[in-house]
Structures are given as C-alpha cells and as structure tokens.
UniProtKB/Swiss-Prot annotation:
InterPro entries: Abitram, GCV_H/Fam206, Single_hybrid_motif. Transmembrane segments: none annotated. PANTHER family: PROTEIN ABITRAM. Keywords: Cell projection, Nucleus. This is Protein Abitram. GO terms for cellular component: dendrite; filopodium tip; growth cone; lamellipodium; nuclear speck. The keyword Chloroplast does not apply.
C-alpha cells in the first residue's frame, strides 16, 4: 500500500491533454527546419518550433528575434478586436511569422504552415529568447492562429501526425547513421 502511495503517477502534460500535435517537416525545402502546430478542440492553433529544429539542437544561442517581415509588414502591428477578430492579419501556409538569428550567423524564418487569422504573437520571446529553447511548446510559442471555421477540418491536410513525424525522424536517423533499410 505504501509503495502505491509513493509511486509517481504519470499524467500527460497540459499541452498533451488539450492539444493535438501536427508537424510540418523541412519547411520550404530546408532540411530539418520543422515546425509544430498545436491544435486545440476549439480550432485555435499555436505555432511552435518542433523539438528537432536546428535552433533547439547543438547548443545554438539565439541572437535576435524579429517579427518585422518586410518594410511594410510587422507582425507586432497586428491589432485584433471583437468577437470576429477584426483587424487580424490573414496568413497563408507560406506566410513568414518571424525571423530568428543565432550567434553562429544562421538565420531561420518561421512560417505559419496553416491558413488563418493571426490572433497574437509571443512578445515575451523578444525579451527572453531562451524561452524558445527551454519551453518550446508552452511559453516559447511563436504565434496563435485561428483558421476559418469552414477550413478548420481541412487545415491539417498536408501536415504530419505525431506518429508520421516520428517515422520521419527515425528515417533521418537511419540516413545519418548510414543504415538505410529497404522499404
């Protein structure tokens, strides 16, 4: 009985309990630049970096994060109001959300990966970029996007489920170790 009380119970995290993970691998043809989309049952999607993104690997240090996409477009200028989210910027699958540079000179562009309205960007990562590395699925998210109601069921077409993504990671590891097996 005492052993049962002392036994640690494994509960799923809040993210795993309320969100379904979807992945986009090799975004824009760039190897290993994977994004994760957390989809809630209420349609809201949170864009994050996938665990295997190069920024989260190899001890990289983040130098700057910029939501300034072009001279006329800053994601920080997104002002949303009202029930129908008036004023929200509309995003396509290939719309850039932010640019992140590391101290080794690499620059990564993070894309929306889904169509919808930009509800908010995470301004906390501007002051504390390490949140991206320390808590990529929670406090280190990139942006919150709301797909159109009529597209909410099809928004994940072209994205990978967690199981499909894990299979891709295994195949990358096999290629990296030189032990590719015939399918």
């Amino acid at each position: 009985m005492a052993e049962e009380c002392n036994k640690l119970l494994e509960f799923p995290s809040v993210v795993d309990r309320y969100f379904k993970r979807w992945y986009k691998s090799d975004v824009k043809g760039k190897p290993c630049e994977d994004h994760c989309i957390l989809q809630h049952s209420n349609r809201i999607c949170i864009i994050t970096l996938a665990e295997c993104h190069p920024l989260l690997q190899n001890g990289k240090t983040i130098k700057t994060i910029s939501y300034q996409i072009s001279a006329n477009c800053s994601r920080l200028q997104n002002k949303v109001s009202g029930k129908s989210k008036r004023g929200a910027q509309f995003l396509t699958e290939h719309a850039p959300l932010c640019r992140i540079s590391s101290t080794d000179g690499e620059e990564y562009t993070i894309y929306s990966c889904i169509r919808g309205r930009l509800l908010e960007v995470n301004e906390n990562i501007l002051q504390n970029p390490e949140l991206l590395k320390e808590k990529p699925s929670t406090e280190g998210y990139i942006a919150v996007v709301l797909p159109k109601f009529e597209e909410s069921k099809t928004v994940t077409e072209g994205l990978l489920s967690q199981q499909e993504y894990e299979e891709i990671l295994l195949s990358r590891a096999a290629v990296g170790s030189g032990t590719v097996s015939a399918v």
